[in-house]
Design a protein with these regions (language model features):
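Intrinsically disordered, low-complexity linker/assembly segments
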Residues: 157, 162-165, 177
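Short intrinsically disordered coil segments
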Residues: 101, 139-145, 175-181, 226-227
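Short, charged alpha-helical interaction segments and adjacent helix-coil junctions
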Residues: 2-8, 82-87, 183-290
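Accessory alpha/beta interaction modules
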Residues: 1-158, 168
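Short conserved micro-motifs at the rims of enzyme active sites and ligand-binding pockets
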Residues: 136-137, 171-175, 222
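Compact structured core domains
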Residues: 167-170, 177-188
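Polybasic (Lys/Arg-rich)
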Residues: 164-167, 201
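Generic recognition of short, well-ordered alpha-helical interface segments
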Residues: 26-30, 93, 173-176, 198-205, ...
Length: 290
């Protein structure tokens, strides 16, 4: 129905494709469905009904910066800011990065003369293709809470992290709207995608939109450039991880060698003490014979 070779060849976690799919005015209903799926943890409730894009265009200058993040930013009818992005490679800083994005978007709301009470909630959503947090749940949400009774300070901070690999490791059919979107983003097989499309018309719309993606040479060019960058980044991260592992092992071996050297030194010291003891005893025996 919707699934063809061009669809299966696409990496939906490519940030250029993600923004192309979800960052367009005519495909806003798709984005709203994905956002609501995250905010309601998969229920069918729609708490966000409108979304005004703050950056609708794919800026060519931004695209030239290989390390630029092609996120989607907008606000709801009540002024709530929402930022959503995908991350493929683990840079080991996603917690700091998302907190920085949140703080930047939150602080830039105020104009000169406005009150702090005019600040609106800011929501950041990060869909990650790697595991990061020490828990089995694939969806983590962070707010500002009181240390002992866990009462929220307010509702202005919401950081959502979706760890795709943790969901994939469950090896089950989607149980709700959020999991159907995760199946779509995780590039699963055609049969599963068609089932998800039949159950969610917005996923069907996304698959239909993909058919047109490769028809524009400019879009395909930037998609390929981002893919190359992601591959290079993955290769660099793998090399760094390997070097760090080797350094850690070398440090461990050096520590063990140092420990062994210390033990050998202590044994030598004990052996010398024993030798001195026997030498003294031998000299005493000689003196007694005299």
């Amino acid at each position: 129905m919707f699934v063809g070779s061009i669809i299966m060849a696409l990496n939906r976690l490519n940030d250029y494709l993600f923004k192309w799919l979800f960052g367009q005015e005519d495909r806003k209903p798709m984005l709203l469905d994905l956002i609501n799926a995250v905010l309601t943890d998969g229920s069918d409730e729609n708490i966000i009904v409108d979304f005004e894009f703050k950056d609708r265009e794919l800026d060519p200058q931004k695209l030239k910066d290989k390390e630029a993040t092609l996120d989607i930013l907008g606000k709801t009818s009540d002024g709530t800011l929402i930022n959503i992005e995908v991350q493929v490679e683990n840079q080991h800083d996603i917690d700091h990065r998302m907190l920085y994005y949140w703080a930047k978007n939150y602080s830039l709301q105020l104009m000169s003369g406005e009150e702090y009470t005019d600040l609106k909630p800011t929501i950041c959503i990060c869909i990650m293709n790697f595991n990061y947090f020490p828990r089995d749940r694939y969806h983590s949400c962070y707010n500002v809470l009181e240390r002992l009774d866990h009462q929220p300070l307010n509702n202005d901070m919401n950081l959502h992290f979706i760890e795709l690999k943790k969901w994939a490791d469950l090896k089950r059919k989607p149980l709700n709207r959020l999991e159907r979107w995760l199946l779509y983003l995780a590039n699963n097989n055609p049969k599963e995608l068609e089932e998800a499309a039949y159950e969610n018309r917005y996923i069907a719309s996304a698959l239909a939109a993909e058919v047109n993606f490769g028809l524009d040479d400019n879009d395909r060019y930037w998609y390929d450039m981002r893919e190359k960058f992601l591959m290079d980044q993955g290769s660099i991260n793998a090399k760094v991880a390997r070097v760090e592992k080797e350094a850690k092992e070398a440090k461990k071996e050096a520590k063990e060698a140092k420990k062994e050297a210390k033990e050998a030194k202590n044994k030598l010291k004990e052996a010398k003490a024993e030798a001195e003891k026997f030498k003294a005893l031998y000299e005493q025996l000689l003196n007694n014979k005299k």
